[in-house]
């Protein structure tokens, strides 16, 4: 199953439909997660793997990725040899939706136990983040505290996904109407959501300084 998921590129129409950063995303009830896994194997060389997941059998794409993490990142937890050095990985996700609250909490918990894994998440749209005190907003703040870099996708990110994950048959990526405006709007919204996190960090710093 893993080989199948890793080898299949997204159809063009499916990518455009699910990743379109429209304000009213009707009918987009699944999360698509395109990923890149990198590991440094030398001063000037890295291993590189990529693929995509989507929700399957009530399992969210984020949790599905974690389920296959051992196969995607061999040596992440070591090989059972005493005193061995665990391998470090850098993972980038490009998600059609930002993670739900439960996935965010579980991811943050997992990352706290896996310091040799670095995760960046690019999102096309924000999931259930309109309400000020929503659990989804709190989940994103928790991910940030866990060291995850969360960013709203811009034109260059959509272009990269088109080049990397889509069966495009040499066709060029064409920006849809209001791609840039929606990206800027969502980026500002995400910044406001994550702002309390930065305020708390400042408070902690002031406490350490005795101010």
Language model regions located:
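Zinc-dependent deaminase catalytic domain
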Residues: 1-211
